[in-house]
């Protein structure tokens, strides 16, 4: 995913010709940060999500997903703003999330670039719109359809319709893991 994303990002930068401030937005869990140690622990101890999740996040021990750190450093070097949009709890998890990202050398891990789920957030769309206020959002990264767009209703049919609608963007503007 990240290797092809680098090629796509270069295309977007070239196409932009310096006209707009460019940004990319990434989900955190299983896209930037690897939580397989938590998943393994939960499996061995017969726990189901979200049991133990908050404690895992607070431990700030997740390592980057393979290729994420290198790609993000590349995007940073190219002058692209990086935003992390996650459904982690804004009140409980912001400090630990920022600490984890910084410890792993993930660029632009400042609070203004880590957009976690607040009490009133129903979806990630409102946080994507925050980025789009003063940026051209050229790429989205995630491991779930909801990291890219929000279905009007949570049915298999509405998800299939969204996939059909956006299928030409997958692998280009929308990188799915």
Predicted stretch roles:
Residues 26-28, 142:
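Active-site flanking residues adjacent to catalytic metal/cofactor-binding acidic residues
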Residues 1-26:
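Non-catalytic pre-domain segments flanking phosphatase-related domains
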Residues 10, 14, 38, 73-81, ...:
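Sec-exported extracytoplasmic/periplasmic mature domains
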Residues 54-83, 90-91:
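Short, acidic loop-to-helix structural element flanking the phosphoryl-transfer center
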């Amino acid at each position: 995913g990240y290797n092809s994303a680098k090629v796509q990002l270069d295309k977007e930068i070239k196409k932009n010709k310096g006209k707009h401030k460019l940004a990319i937005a990434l989900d955190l869990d299983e896209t930037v940060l690897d939580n397989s140690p938590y998943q393994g622990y939960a499996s061995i101890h017969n726990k189901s999500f979200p049991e133990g999740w908050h404690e895992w996040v607070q431990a700030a021990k997740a390592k980057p997903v393979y290729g994420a750190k290198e790609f993000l450093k590349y995007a940073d070097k190219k002058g692209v703003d990086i935003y992390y949009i996650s459904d982690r709890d804004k009140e409980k998890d912001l400090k630990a999330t920022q600490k984890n990202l910084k410890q792993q050398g993930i660029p632009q891990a400042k609070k203004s670039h880590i957009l976690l789920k607040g009490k009133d957030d129903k979806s990630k769309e409102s946080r994507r719109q925050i980025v789009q206020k003063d940026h051209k959002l050229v790429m989205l990264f995630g491991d779930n359809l909801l990291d890219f767009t929000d279905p009007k209703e949570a049915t298999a049919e509405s998800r299939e319709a969204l996939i059909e609608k956006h299928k030409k963007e997958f692998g280009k503007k929308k990188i799915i893991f």
